Structures are given as structure tokens and as C-alpha cells.
């Protein structure tokens, strides 16, 4: 828990005069990184792995933050704080750090990052400040990559379907069954925020949520409005493209300095990664059925108020992992929790973003609570999640967000001597 003096310092850091974030190196390289880990177009039939992409984003931002913070030293480091001249270029350090992490993905990306970094560095005046910044960023990137080398991200997916010998089960491979065993960036364990079990199938709440989803989440629903359908499709997008553009705009609107941008965006990037670990821990621990399974088996759940619909289908393809709790909800809850805790209010400047899954549609928000609520409703209207699961997911995310702000990269008690 932060002492009162530290919270006062954090408030001063966030309300002090800052450099406008237009063209900020942190937001620039966040955008580049998102395009690398989840390109807008890729080979036919290839689906980017959301959780792997978010892990890389966490590493990119941790490297940028520790590089910039080694120069300014206004926060405690995430992993490492290296000696650095105060005159060292923050822009060169952050760019080299981000490129250094991304270059480890594969040789093709390494070649692309070499060119991207050279182009970016060409905009920075030559001199010792620039060269020192590049060296600093490269060293920090290497240390972040080394620290995450054996975090379990590359473990094989060994999910074992529950079945009776000789009986067919759907043959598609589930997603992220190994992710509950990945080492978190900040949480003490994957199960640190594991929620209580799903509600009883015999309860009134189950019947209420079942029937809400059955009515509003079906592919041919006559209850769901055109606006609700649009919102459901808007939030079919997943991973870094769903949340990082929102955060970039928020940083810009708040006119954060380079270091405060690095701090805030690293909290979010690490928080989103740990939220995915936490939600997959809960999903595979409880192994709760998806609506398409529940509604087609509504006659065997022991609840007389849930009527079976033999041909029911969701609005879009159901994600290939257990239902409880809602993953999109824990991610939006994490973003909302971090922003609300850092800024001291859920109210924000108006932020507008588009979606890769709803071309031509723009959504706007002025409140983080409303942002998280929209995501929760979207997952119900898409036919993927029950109301109780969205509430639990959002609450988990808010807890993780609050934990991130109060547990990592806190304001330094005093400026370190250079």
C-alpha cells in the first residue's frame, strides 16, 4: 500500500505541467508494436494469438518504461534501473528499447525493426544524448527479454477434452489452456484473483441470465436492436487492437510527459497481460459451459425455467475456451481500474475509437465505467457470456487494475542521485 506522501507525489506528477503527447515516442512505438504483434491483415487462415500478442506488448512497455525511468528516476523501476546521464535522449532510449524487444520475435521482424528504428532515430539530433539513449534502450530491452524467457509462454497446449472412450467430442483445439501456468508480470500467482464458482444452475439468477442471453444473443434474435448488434460486432475485436488505441488517445488527451506516458501505458500493458493469465486460470479451473452448449441442453440443467432451444446459435463464432468469467470484461475492467485509480475519477476526456470488426463504426466514451459496461453488454448481445459472468469479469479487472497501480512502479520517494 502506498504511503500518503507517495500518493501525494503521484498526484503532483500527474497534474504538473506536461509536454503534449502528440508524436510522443511511447504512443508512437505502442502503435508500431500493435501493428507487429497483431497485423491488420495477415496470411489467409491465420488468426493472431491474442494472449501471446499481449505478452509482447507488456515486454515492449516494460522496456520503454525502465529505459526512460533510468534517465528521469521519478518512479521505482519495473525490473531494472541503469546509470544514465540526465541529458540522455528519452526518445532514443524508448525507441531502442521497444525495437529491441520486438526484434526478438523472429528474423523478419528483426529486419523490419532495424529499418523502423533507423527511420525514427533519424528524427533525433546526432550527439552523445542520442547514442547514449540507444545504448541504454538496447541494454534494458535485453534484460526484459531475458527475464521473460522462461515464463511458460511457449509451453505446449496439452488440454485434455473430457469424454467417454469412443464418444465423439468437437475436434477444434481450445485456446490458451497453458496460459494459467504463465508467470505473471506483477501478480503473485495466476490464481491471486480467482473468483468464486459460477452460480448454481438451479438458481433463479441462472434462469434469468440464461433467458436474457437466449433472447438477446442469438444469431436471429428479434429482441436485439440494430444498435445492440452493432455494439456486439464492435467488440468482436480482441487483443491489443481493442484496448491500446483507446489508451493512446487517453494519454494524448491528458497531455502526459514521456515518462508519465511510459508509466501509465506500462501499467495498462502489464495489467492486461496479467488479467489474461488470471481469467484463463479461472476459466480452466471452473470449465463452465458456453451458451451454445447450455441453451441446446436447457432441458437437463435441473432448472424448470430454462427451456431448451435445439437450433440456437450465437451472433458470431464462440471463442474456443470456457465461459466463466468473461475475458473481454476483465480486460476492460483492468483498463478502467487503472485509469480510475491513477486519475482519481472515472470521468475522462472524450475518447473515440474504431473497430477492426465493425468497419466504419466509431464509438465514444467520457467515462471509464460506461466503457466497461459497454464491453460487458456487447458480450451478452454477441451470445458469448451470461450477465453474472460479465459482472464477475469486470470486478476482477477492476481489482487487478487497482492492484497494479498500488504494487508496481510506484513514485520514487526521492529523486535518485545521478
Predicted features and spans:
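Bacterial N-terminal signal peptides that target proteins for export
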Residues: 1-8
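Bacterial N-terminal signal peptides
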Residues: 8-17
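Acidic/polar surface patches and capping/hinge elements
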Residues: 21-418
Amino acid at each position: 500500500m502506498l504511503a500518503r506522501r507517495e500518493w501525494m507525489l503521484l498526484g503532483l506528477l500527474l497534474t504538473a505541467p506536461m509536454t503534449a503527447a502528440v508524436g510522443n515516442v511511447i504512443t508512437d512505438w505502442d502503435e508500431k508494436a500493435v501493428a507487429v504483434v497483431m497485423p491488420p491483415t495477415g496470411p489467409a487462415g491465420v488468426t493472431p494469438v491474442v494472449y501471446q500478442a499481449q505478452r509482447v506488448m507488456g515486454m515492449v512497455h516494460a522496456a520503454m518504461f525502465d529505459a526512460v525511468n533510468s534517465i528521469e528516476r521519478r518512479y521505482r523501476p519495473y525490473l531494472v534501473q541503469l546509470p544514465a546521464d540526465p541529458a540522455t535522449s528519452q526518445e532514443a532510449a524508448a525507441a531502442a528499447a521497444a525495437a529491441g524487444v520486438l526484434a526478438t520475435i523472429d528474423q523478419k521482424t528483426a529486419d523490419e525493426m532495424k529499418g523502423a528504428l533507423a527511420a525514427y532515430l533519424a528524427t533525433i539530433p546526432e550527439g552523445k544524448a542520442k547514442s547514449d539513449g540507444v545504448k541504454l534502450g538496447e541494454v534494458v530491452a535485453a534484460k526484459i527479454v531475458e527475464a521473460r524467457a522462461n515464463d511458460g509462454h511457449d509451453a505446449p497446449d496439452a488440454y485434455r477434452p473430457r469424454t467417454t472412450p469412443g464418444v465423439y467430442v468437437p475436434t477444434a483445439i481450445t485456446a490458451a489452456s497453458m496460459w494459467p501456468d504463465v508467470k505473471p508480470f506483477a501478480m503473485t500467482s495466476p490464481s491471486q484473483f480467482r473468483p468464486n464458482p459460477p452460480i448454481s444452475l438451479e438458481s433463479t439468477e441462472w434462469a434469468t441470465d440464461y433467458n436474457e442471453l437466449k433472447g438477446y444473443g442469438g444469431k436471429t434474435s428479434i429482441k436485439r436492436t440494430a444498435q445492440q448488434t452493432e455494439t456486439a460486432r464492435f467488440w468482436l475485436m480482441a487483443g491489443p487492437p481493442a484496448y491500446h488505441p483507446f489508451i493512446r488517445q487517453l494519454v494524448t488527451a491528458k497531455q502526459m510527459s514521456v515518462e508519465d506516458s511510459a508509466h501509465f501505458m506500462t501499467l495498462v500493458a502489464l495489467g492486461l497481460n496479467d488479467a489474461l493469465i488470471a481469467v484463463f486460470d479461472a476459466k480452466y479451473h471452473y470449465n463452465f459451459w458456453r451458451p451454445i452448449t447450455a441453451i441446446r441442453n436447457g432441458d437437463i440443467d435441473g432448472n424448470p425455467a430454462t427451456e431448451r432451444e435445439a437450433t440456437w446459435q450465437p451472433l458470431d463464432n464462440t471463442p474456443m475456451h470456457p465461459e466463466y468469467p468473461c475475458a473481454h470484461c476483465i480486460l476492460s475492467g483492468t483498463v478502467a481500474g487503472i485509469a480510475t485509480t491513477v486519475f482519481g475519477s472515472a470521468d475522462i476526456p472524450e475518447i473515440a475509437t474504431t473497430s477492426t470488426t465493425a468497419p466504419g463504426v466509431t464509438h465514444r466514451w467520457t467515462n471509464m465505467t460506461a466503457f466497461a459496461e459497454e464491453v460487458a453488454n456487447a458480450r451478452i448481445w454477441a451470445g458469448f457470456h451470461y450477465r453474472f459472468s460479465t459482472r464477475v469479469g469486470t470486478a476482477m479487472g477492476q481489482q487487478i487494475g487497482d492492484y497494479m497501480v498500488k504494487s508496481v512502479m510506484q513514485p520514487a520517494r526521492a529523486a535518485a542521485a545521478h
